[in-house]
Amino acid sequence: MKRKYIFLWCASFLAAGIFFASFFEFSLFGGGLFLFLSLMGVLSGRVFGKTGAVWVCGALFLCAAGAVRMEMAEEIWRQQSQYIVGSEGTFCGIVAEEPLVYKGEDGYARYLIDLRKIRYADGEEKSISGTVYLYDFAVENKYPVGTALEAEGKLRPLRLYKNPGKIDLEKRYESEHLLGRIYSKENNRIRPAGETGEYRVTRWAETMRERLACSFASYMDPVRLPVLMTLLFGGHYSEIPKDIIHSFSVTGIIHILSVSGSHIALLFGFLYFLGKWLGLSMKVTVVPAVLLVLVYAAMSGFVPPVIRASLMGILAVIGVLLERGRTALNLLGAAVAGMLLWNPYFLFDISFQLSVCASAGILLFYEPLRHALALLGKIPPRICEGCALSTAAQILVLPI
């Protein structure tokens, strides 16, 4: 077990603990006790110079930490107001994120609503917690993030399909504390109740994206504008015509429609050369560069690939600044460990899985594959690099 990959091992054991906790029930007290005992084992091993015991107890400690963190997250999910599923009344809540809009004859806008209370037909009110998807078929009524809404309807349960090969969204719904769906097909069933001042960062990001889109709108047609905004910030796939999405898919470049490490690398590279051109030192340049990357991540919605790429980029820049030996696999491990501690449900998110596996595949297999292709002697170097990169990214992704 190489020490330079310490964060990679940390992430692996944390993930193992989270995976274990998602299938087996245990109490937080029992998990905390095991966590304490394994920590004592690490400290005892250090005191008595037992390196093997330190590694074993350290691995157990990380597994226990992952399991406890997952149990804490599931306990929060169990405390949500799941008993209201199937209830009918007026649901009061706040728009938590930018709506997903589908245009056309049967178009609708889907809002994620952070519930606060329910008002029944007899006038009784109850405070509730959790989120719901609210479907508004009046697409022209767009409510910004942070707006309080009152929606009349019935809270219908989520449909979870267990078909082989279909993405299992159960853990993602639990992560969002999602209870169900409310459909509003009649007029005046959704009423705005003013601004709340909550979700300010998300509201700011939404406003900035809209302003940027408006500035581009005078130079681009309505078809290309959504493509540009998706290339810049990801998401909004529903606004791109299906034939264009199909063209990206059949040509094998649909992945550029999602934000990835290349976006972060380009941003850091641009700021580095800008600082160099202005005569600024690396230490002076790195602070605004990190801040700008965080702003960009916020504007992109803090989805798992953006968080991973941003964390890896920031850690790499800090490593350069401190003039430490840099190991890309270790940086990936640090980013993954941080994300899993923040939200253990990320482990079950298909976006997170594909992003991490593709990155790990490139870091592990790119150089060996490139070297193997170069030994053939008949393939130009650029083609060797392209083939090796593409193949390496697919190796760990294929099982998923």
Residue ranges and their predicted role:
Residues Y5, W9, I240-I400:
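Hydrophobic alpha-helical transmembrane segments in multi-pass membrane proteins
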Residues M1-Q82:
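N-terminal leader/targeting segments
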Residues K4, L8, G30-G32, G52-V56, ...:
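Catalytic cores of large soluble enzymes that bind and process phosphate-bearing ligands
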Residues C10, C57, C63, C92, ...:
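Generic recognition of cysteine residues
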Residues A59-H255:
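Membrane-interface helix/helix-cap signal primarily in integral membrane proteins
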